[in-house]
Swiss-Prot record:
Protein name: Cytochrome c biogenesis protein CcsA
Pfam families, per the entry: Cytochrom_C_asm
Compartment(s): Plastid, Chloroplast thylakoid membrane
Subunit record text: May interact with Ccs1.
Tagged with keyword Membrane: yes
């Protein structure tokens, strides 16, 4: 009873903080960025991280098993993973690009998990026999950490593509205007050229930063995903007598692994870095959501215990 009440309190606190942080983000987005407000939102995410940590520990103690047995618990852990990735650049103060992705990801995931949509599966139940194994922590935690890192890295690649597309589009339109004006304003040609060069330099620097951090975060996520798949195969052999059963979840996890293996391969080729490898990562972003969330909507296969309740099928 005590643990249930504590869990209920932590859930409401985290949801309230998330709501406040979302409001702050909207204000700083619509109005010129206010440093104090932005810093408050960053601290709010850190407080949310500790609330989620307390929620996971409380649920673990009350249920007697690590809280990764259903969709609700995995969403909470996914939000915790986003928050963990977010905290590292926050304290380093020099990786603001990454925090721009991890912050909103943690907020939205936690907001969805603690909203009323998944009320029916908030209560922790008894583990099905297949999940009563020490491999639960190793396999599922590695998979969720992998999803979190890969999603963050993929979003950085999406941002890279958007900026590159806008850059090419604006350069084409502005070059025409610049050439036309040059005939009438010959004395301003040098000043205009200097302005465009400076602007393009900073944009190129941003694209390089996005590409660099996308590669690093995806490499980390790929490592987690690989460990998760291998540990899952060992667990499957112990539980079902086979390392691989081509279950829908297993199949899509394998597809996810292949897509990001292709990304890492293209990223090592200098001619394919930047937009080309970012396209592969962007495709991977969609594949991850199909693997993690889409398969759960079907509620079929050996991993159906993690699906939505019957009212959503």
């Amino acid at each position: 009873m005590i643990f249930s009440t504590l869990e209920h309190i932590l859930t409401h606190i985290s949801f309230s903080i998330v709501s406040i942080v979302i409001t702050i983000h909207l204000i700083t987005f619509l109005v010129d960025e206010i440093v104090k407000l932005y810093d408050s939102s960053e601290k709010g995410i850190i407080v949310t991280f500790f609330c989620i940590t307390g929620l996971l520990v409380t649920r673990w103690v009350s249920s007697g098993h690590f809280p990764l047995s259903d969709l609700y618990e995995s969403l909470i852990f996914l939000s915790w993973s986003f928050s963990l990735i977010h905290i590292i650049p926050y304290f380093k103060k020099n990786v603001l690009i990454l925090s721009k992705i991890t912050g909103p990801s943690a907020i939205l995931t936690q907001g969805f998990a603690t909203s009323g949509i998944l009320t029916e599966i908030h209560q922790s139940g008894i583990l099905v026999p297949a999940l009563q194994s020490e491999w639960l922590i190793m396999h599922v935690s590695m998979m969720i950490l992998g999803y979190a890192a890969l999603l963050c890295g993929s979003l950085l690649s999406v941002a890279l593509l958007v900026i590159t597309f806008r850059k090419n589009r604006k350069l084409f339109s502005k070059s025409n205007v610049f050439l036309n004006e040059s005939f009438f304003l010959g004395e301003n040609v040098v000043e205009n050229t200097s302005f465009f060069c400076t602007k393009n330099y900073y944009r190129s620097q941003l694209i390089q930063q996005l590409d660099y951090w996308s590669y690093r975060v995806i490499s980390l996520g790929f490592t987690f995903l690989t460990i998760g798949i291998l540990s899952g195969a060992v667990w499957a052999n112990e539980a079902w007598g086979s390392y691989w059963n081509w279950d829908p979840k297993e199949t899509w996890a394998f597809i996810t692994w292949i897509v990001f293996a292709i990304y890492l391969h293209t990223r090592t080729n200098r001619n394919l870095r930047g937009p080309n490898s970012a396209i592969v990562a962007s495709i991977g972003f969609l594949i991850i959501w199909i693997c993690y969330f889409g398969v759960n909507l079907l509620g079929i296969g050996l991993h159906s215990y993690g699906s939505f309740p019957s009212t959503f099928n």
